[in-house]
Amino acid sequence: MAVTAETSMPGANSNDRQSAAANDAGGMPAPRRTRASAEAARYGVLRRLAPALKHDMVVNLQAISMMAEVLNAKLERGSPAPVEFHASIAKLNRLAREAVANCLKVASWIEPGEDEGVRLAEGVDDCLSLLASNFNFRGFVVIKDVPESPFQVSRVVLRHLLVASLITLTDAAQGPCEVHVKAEVVTGMAEISVRISPRQDGFEGLPFEANYRELEWQDVQALAQAESVELIRGTDNITMRMPRAIATAPLQIAPV
């Protein structure tokens, strides 16, 4: 189901100034520079998510391999009872279906299909779940304030901007922090804010070195400008305002 925005919000004023500066520089045209910056930011987000995406894709495949080895060992010892054999095959089929679903989910981060709407709370959880292991390792505690709401936003836009904001703020942190994530509907727009504050319990996170470059404020700006999302930056927080996602194509029923 493809979606479009109900309204279009301009990017931050700083983005407009950046576009003007690009034209004045006499180099790449501003629209092309904006697209290139957004693509670089998207690539940076995916590279930083790569370990988590790889884990999500491999975990079910490993389970299938282990189950197949167990079943093979039983067959080598002699034919198992029909009931036991059928139960093992059923479990193997279930694991295979879960593996396919997980692989398709990972692929949707790399190459999204038709954009679709997602409920705000579900979309936020989708992003936080991928960063959970990384944040735990580094000593970041997520405090979430995201009430359930039928309000939907673009899944692709939310993924890129929220993950970029979370990584940008935690990359800039001087140590373990509390990461406050709040999402609500304000005057017909989804307002998502991310704020960090130092932990007060003296916890020391493990040394961490990013698998790819650190993300910066310019990356978040480029993504927001490309998607026409309003963006506000504070000293230790980022707030974004996203329009409602509206379906523009009929639902497609997948063949069984």
Regions of interest found by a model, annotated:
Residues 141-150:
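Conserved catalytic submotifs in the C-terminal HATPase_c
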Residues 67-70, 83-138:
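Conserved DHp (HisKA) dimerization/phosphotransfer helix of two-component histidine kinases, i.e.
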Residues 47-70, 152-181, 213-227:
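Conserved ATP-binding N-box helix of the HATPase_c
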Residues 28-31, 35-38, 42-49, 60-98, ...:
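Histidine phosphotransfer helical core of two-component systems
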Residues 225-240:
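Glycine-rich ATP-binding loops of the HATPase_c
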Residues 186-221, 242-245, 249-253:
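Glycine-rich/acidic phosphate-handling loop/turn and adjacent ATP-lid/helix
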Residues 1-45:
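Conserved signal-transmission helix
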Residues 125-141, 164-171, 219:
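Conserved short alpha-helical segment within the C-terminal cytosolic histidine kinase catalytic core
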